Amino acid sequence: MSSIRYHSSAFDDGSFSVMARNLENMVNRANAQYVKIDKHREPYTVHYNALRDKVYSEWKESGVLGTLLKGSTLCGGYGDKLKVSMPDEFDLLIHLVFPENDKIIVKADASKKGNVILDMTKVMEIIGSQEHNKPVFDLLQKIVNKKKQLLEDKLNSLLQSIMTQTLNKMGNQIEVAGRISHLEYKKCGPAHTIFVKGPCEYSVDFVPAIRLSAAQVVLAPEQRRHFGGTLYWDAIPKPMKPAKTDNASFRASFYEAERSLLLGKQSLKPAIRLLKQNRNVKNKANLKSYHIKTLFLWQVVQQDASYWSNSPKDIFIEMLGKLADSLALTPKKGKLPFFWDPKLDMFAELTDSQRTDLFNHFRKCEYTFRKDNGNVNDCTENNVHSSFSINTR
């Protein structure tokens, strides 16, 4: 499918072409006014960079763990250039690499779709006799189970202690450009989150990630093709819900591969930003950013490359419909398969009432935009404004 076509007799004879362009102009103006973060980007980025460098350097000096740190990757909405409204959330993968890291035996977790188990047996056999790696071996002894499987909760407990020590050393504050900002630390899922209060107010999720090579990937053949020539992927110590003691299950994360898949698709990212902004404005927090990203990842592999040359407005409208279909409970229950393991339905965790609320909103939004796309009227500008602006008229 290379182009999006709306079935309307008015459209077929071209009589409403000017009106259609007017809706597009309205959406483009809303994008420039409410969605883009360009005017706020520099001060927040400067502040974030200072905090990132300080925390990373403190982690680097934190004994054995510091020897495992091998750089970081800005990910999430900001890293993907999908952040909307304000640059007030940053997601940072902190890469951990063990000695003999390529000897980690990775297995799919049969009891948790989308997760993997990291068997450290061969790693520990090799480094156990190496004097220079004795500190790492001793650390591993504390964070693996009897089967030598790495434990999420033990690793996170260690990192939580290190982050607490880091903030204490910093006095729970940081000075940037002569101004003091106060810092608060909370453990949020897999992330070690710092909330910044000061001239720039934002949060940073420091997410630990065991960096693994392409040779260690455990994917079905089709998903392996989507992984392509990507060199690395990560295993994230994401706690179970409810929390589980001695948890050997890690969430597989393919951020680098996803970034490659989203790259160079003309209107893809603008359309994602429109959908995220609408979600934010309407307070539909049960729809996560990764849900939206996943919806588009599936379209990347299903649509012809020329599809993304359609306008962001047209793609946005079509994705509203696909999202609503995925959320529907009747007549057939929809689903949003995890891109890297389609057996996992990412909407399965939502209650029926949450799904119904999201479905009703996005189906109504789709209807409104499709109607306005074929018949711009006095209400159209207000509809566009209310869809993307937190300020009411």
From Swiss-Prot:
What is its EC class?
transferase
Establish whether keyword Manganese is in the entry. Answer: yes
How is it regulated at the activity level? The enzyme activity is specifically activated by double-stranded RNA (dsRNA). Recognizes long dsRNA (>30 bp) with no preference for 5' RNA phosphorylation.
Residues given in the record as Mg(2+) binding sites? 89, 91, 205
| InterPro entries in alphabetical order | Mab-21-like_nuc_Trfase, Mab-21_HhH/H2TH-like, MAB21L/cGLR
Alphabetized GO MF terms? 2',3'-cyclic GMP-AMP synthase activity; 3',2'-cyclic GMP-AMP synthase activity; ATP binding; double-stranded RNA binding; GTP binding; metal ion binding
Annotated binding of GTP, by residue:
205, 251-258
Q: Name the Gene Ontology biological process terms.
A: cellular response to virus; cGAS/STING signaling pathway; defense response to virus; immune response involved in response to exogenous dsRNA; innate immune response
Gene3D superfamilies associated with the record:
1.10.1410.40, 3.30.460.90
E.C. number(s) listed in UniProt: 2.7.7.-
Which Pfam families does the protein's record reference? Mab-21, Mab-21_C
Q: Which family does it belong to?
A: Belongs to the mab-21 family.
Q: What is this protein called?
A: Cyclic GMP-AMP synthase-like receptor 1
Q: What is the scientific name of the source organism? A: Drosophila simulans (Fruit fly)
Q: What is the lineage of its organism?
A: Eukaryota, Metazoa, Ecdysozoa, Arthropoda, Hexapoda
